[in-house]
Amino acid sequence: MKRRTFLSFLAYSATFTHLIGKQAYIFQNSERAKALSDAGNVLLLLQKQKKNVISLVLQGRKFKRNVDHHYPHPKGVHDESSGYRVFFHGHRNGEYGHFHTFIYHPKGYTHLLMISLDKSGMPIMMSTLNQWVTNDVHLDEQEMIEAYSNFSMDPGLFPDKRSYYFLSYLLKGYKTEIITLMKERTLALRSYFDINGKNPDTDEKLEILSSFHIHTSDLGV
């Protein structure tokens, strides 16, 4: 009798664990869908106003495709309270421009993600970069994931709050993909070291460590 009771308990526990896991999966998917939908809604609203995310950060200024020209301000937007910084510029082939996101910490600052846009302001790719690109301080995989997961800035620091909300929704919605990017970044660094016997941080032939393409259908636009 005791054995039967114990086996029943195990079966119940397994079923309960499965249900909890399934509910967590559904919650994560619904959270993802909402965040990406919110990002898409920002884009759709801007389209109706004949604007886009790029026009929000340019604020009527002429866009100069130059690595040294940053928008919306010369030093971008820096939230000293949270330690995060964002700026937009353009200079790479295959895109119109991109946002850089950074975290400032006791060791210095570290680049988190590059978010590439096409000319219409639609997001097309997210990437992690080699150190020489932004001359930053290396953080390990777990530190990168933690810094990304805590991304938060004061929307009032942006000339138009919608540009911040768009970035925030996008980063939240693609959490699974971004964490994978961070892991692939680690693998790329290890692979380079195994092959070349040195770190890749100063190798200017290696710019992007990991990336994934964004499908605007995810955003409902």
Provide a role label for each language-model segment.
Residues 23-221:
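Metal-centered catalytic cores of metalloenzymes
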Residues 5-24:
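N-terminal export signals
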